[in-house]
Amino acid sequence: MARIAGVNIPTNKRVLIALTYIHGIGRAKATEITTSLGIPAERRVNQLTDDEVLKIRELIDRDFQVEGDLRRAVAMNIKRLMDLGCYRGLRHRRGLPVHGQRTHTNARTRKGPAKPIAGKKKVTK
Amino acid sequence: MARSVWKGPFLDGYMLGKADKARASGRNEVIKIWSRRSTILPQFVGLTFGVYNGQKFIPVLVTENMIGHKFGEFSPTRTFYGHAVDKKAKRK
């Protein structure tokens, strides 16, 4: 059990993998952290010494934006676009894809589940 | 991919002249522009541009936040009024 960057308690997985449970840290940053601290790849979180945990915590605090701060930063960026009244902001407001994808079909990630169209007959056999 | 820094921001050359003239005249009237692809520069802040959207000129008051965006981003070219509700639709 180790608390790193607030609420995250990665389990008895390898350190490299456990760190990716933190929002804002993926494989690339996890590799960066472990190599710069010289933690061997096969080391698991429950085998970390208190000193190493402390070092990881400090490194993340110093170099990376994670969890709440990162979420807030992303939300602020989106809010800025929306307040600006630019095209990307309008797309965010309407919940449509922002990067110019087609919306004739697909785009279900942004639009959510398909809504039934009134009056359209179902093809039944 | 982002534009190379060494090229500097893109804009059509006559934009600067237009902006200067508008500043010199003092009155804040809408500057009509067709160049939607030009970058908004710091010296445009406070001016109002009429950005052409293919049909009419959409007035855009340039604020500090807009620096780095393109003029076209603030002048939507499409209108979508939503889908009309079909009155003949029957409930089954």
UniProtKB/Swiss-Prot annotation, chain B:
InterPro entries, A to Z: Ribosomal_uS19, Ribosomal_uS19_bac-type, Ribosomal_uS19_CS, Ribosomal_uS19_SF
Signal peptide: none
Ribonucleoprotein as UniProt keyword: yes
Assigned GO CC terms: cytoplasm; small ribosomal subunit
UniProt keyword annotations, A-Z: Ribonucleoprotein, Ribosomal protein, RNA-binding, rRNA-binding
GO biological process: one example: translation
Lineage: superkingdom: Bacteria
Keyword Nucleotidyltransferase: no
GO molecular function: rRNA binding; structural constituent of ribosome
Function: Protein S19 forms a complex with S13 that binds strongly to the 16S ribosomal RNA.
Similarity comment text for this entry: Belongs to the universal ribosomal protein uS19 family.
HAMAP family from the UniProt entry: Ribosomal_uS19
Protein name: Small ribosomal subunit protein uS19
Naturally occurring in which organism (per UniProt): Paramagnetospirillum magneticum (strain ATCC 700264 / AMB-1)
Underlying gene: rpsS
